[in-house]
Amino acid sequence: LGIGIRSGQLRIYELVLKSPTCLFYGVAGAGKTNILLTLTRDLCKKDGPCLYVSTEETLHYEKVGRQVEDYAYTLFTEVYSLDKLLELVFHTSYMNFQTLVVDSINSLYRAVAYEESSLAKFTLLMGFLRNMSELKGLKILASAQVRAGEEDVEASGMSLLDYYFDTIFQVGFEKNKRFVKLVKPRHKATPIKYFEINEKGVVWM
């Protein structure tokens, strides 16, 4: 972890490089998708092929289309049910991807959380992803949606996410600035990094 934090500065890319499983959670519009797209672009040019799974929308294709050569080693797809996401992840275990990106990993669980089998399916999904990371060396990057309370912001299914992900970042707003804060592993002084978003993705400040 030391190479990812120097003089109190949070070095996102270095932390992601050395961590098998990374999660970015935050409120809608905070910049989670842009962070994942930027990391995917930079990682997969060197360590492809990669699979990027969207469970919400396809607006990111416009940004990808403007940098199509930078995403030459990334396959994009969409799924819109928890069952289909599980099926896709199982099939991925037979493929040769180096990195799997899921944006977002808990949105489909949130949609069916009232169903009796949803927690079991979500737990199975998380366990299988962890297993692929440990046995096959597959890097897992994901975002998570949150529910906003009066005093705090917490991702749906956070207890499971915290258990299965090695490195967790909170993405949010501080006054007029966007930030990424390291939540796990925990530190006495919480490292934080500010960023902006332009037409190509995230620019770290």
Give, region by region, the residue ranges found by the protein language model.
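Pre-Walker A adenine-sensing motif
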Residues: 3-17
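Short, glycine/charged-enriched secondary-structure capping and boundary segments
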Residues: 38, 65-69, 114-117, 155-158, ...
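Phosphate-binding/switch region of NTP-binding enzymes
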Residues: 138-205
